[in-house]
């Protein structure tokens, strides 16, 4: 069967109504080529430190992308067949080309999803491919992409510059020595790659490696991390180290948004239980909650912006987790409370202008009921953009519709891509810019905004807001 042409319509994601589409097109034209601010994500700093070529199409575009392989798995594709590493680091003996052929043969499963939008953008604009990916073009794609990746124009730093990225933030464990960030800074390359402090490994008592991570935390800092005060001093020390390597933010991926405000004596007693390995699930939750409030206190001193990404049931598929480990597409959104959960922290620090807490959600029902009213009141609180399962065009639109009335635009932080998939970053930002242009055009067409106001908001959302919110 003959493959069809791959094309990107210039008006994709803009309104169907001609008049509104014309307004959206004018707005989009003002922001389409603005530099990319990527204030939160999971790209590998080693890429930019070593500037080594990416290996092949499969290793770059398929293996790291859980958005893609979770959909393949849902259709009965064994993860071994596409080369996904197992929990022990080993892989099935599958040729990368064979894995790519499996992906191409099932590419139709992504139709209509944001992954298809992003990947088609990558194929068309980054690799200049003009036939759609399918079983018949699988080898053509694999050979073309893999060959391109060995050329100077496709080295990580060249792509960073080609993508017009002004700054990108990676996310590291408190145990990370940040050697790659130091190497980037010492290299003389002008690309700006900063880190972010993600203390989850030494904050979650229910993590299988918590005890070992805590021991490493103490060895790394020289603090007695088996005492509450020593544990807090270790965090302060590592936060300062991260800030010295460019960090402007912290990130916290907790099961819930719970916070607490315990007395020092209560916190010490709880910590004693935690380090003995005797914490109940309720005590583990209380410990995570107290640490969040302690992180807020530290932010008052060191200025690091807090990000909270709660409400995900991690590793829902137990047999898959046991075989392949974490981050294999089996994370599921949960109902999440914010009004009661955040109150202890907000009672303590929510009115202090030195604190900036950016809250995300996987529970869309909380947008208008809880999060927008909270962000529309507390000076310390901002709303992160539609996240993970909701960063599709429809999810971005729902986010704007449900938060605008109570939070406005200026209690949000613009867009962040939150991705491991480096080559998709321009596509993700382009989708967000198109959706925001369409949303603003509707307000102009309804005479709720003047076009010059909408233009200013569009520029703010695409560029100024993330820089300001993340102190970049």
UniProtKB/Swiss-Prot annotation:
Which Pfam families does the record match to this protein? UxaC
Quick check: keyword Isomerase in the entry? Answer: yes
The reaction(s) annotated as catalysed by this protein in its Swiss-Prot or TrEMBL entry are:
D-glucuronate = D-fructuronate; aldehydo-D-galacturonate = keto-D-tagaturonate
Q: Which NCBIfam families match?
A: PRK02925.1
Question: What family does this belong to?
Answer: Belongs to the metallo-dependent hydrolases superfamily. Uronate isomerase family.
Keywords, A to Z, come to: Isomerase
Keyword Cell division on this protein? no
Q: In which pathway does it act?
A: Carbohydrate metabolism; pentose and glucuronate interconversion
Domain of life of the native organism: Bacteria
* Originating species: Xanthomonas oryzae pv. oryzae (strain KACC10331 / KXO85)
> What biological process terms from GO does the record include?
D-galacturonate catabolic process; D-glucuronate catabolic process
List the GO molecular function terms: glucuronate isomerase activity
Q: What is this protein called?
A: Uronate isomerase
